[in-house]
Amino acid sequence: MAIIVEDGSFITSSQWENVEASPKPPPRKPKIVQPKKKPSKHLSNEDALEKYEMLFGERRKEVELDYMSHIAEEETSLSMIEYDRHFALQTDVKLSKKRKSKLVEMTPKGLKKRKRVQIQEGSVSTNTKKRMDGHVVGSSAPAINNGKGKQLLEMMGWSRGKGLGSENQGMVDPVVAVVKNNKQGLH
């Protein structure tokens, strides 16, 4: 017959008799077990930095070297100092213009400058008058003969000149927009 002792080991009955007769051993020190870290979705700052350097470290150096090859030699030291925020220098106008022109040349060929939209002369009316208080806006607008809103209203039983509802008690005329030039807000 086997007996299980507190520490989880198996001993036989003859061993148990010897254990009872012998003095108890000194208590063991408990082992400190570090809790296992669960793998997280996000990297720690150190891990992220290492991964970034592995992925982009070489490419970044290549880009910097490529950029430096396009800059004139007299501008190299200035551009490196200007790159640092703490030592921003006011450079000569000619040098800054040269640098801007070189950067424009370095843009990818696929990107094009935006074209300005030309306004047609007849599309904008120049004789717009300032409207006075109480002037009704849109009264001369043509009636809408087709549209989603009109179709929905007709499906509910509406027809021109009648109100909406079972007894045609709703508004017959459209809502009128009236100009209010004063700055008092809504009334």
From Swiss-Prot:
The lineage of its organism: Eukaryota, Fungi, Dikarya, Ascomycota, Taphrinomycotina. One of its GO terms (molecular function) is nucleic acid binding. Residues 26-41 have a biased composition (Basic residues). Pfam families: G-patch. Residues 145-187 form the G-patch domain. SMART domains: G_patch. The keyword Nucleus applies. Disulfide bonds: none annotated. Its main location: nucleus. It comes from Schizosaccharomyces pombe (strain 972 / ATCC 24843). Coiled coil: none annotated. This is Meiotically up-regulated protein C1442.13c. One of its GO terms (cellular component) is nucleus. One of its GO terms (biological process) is meiotic cell cycle.
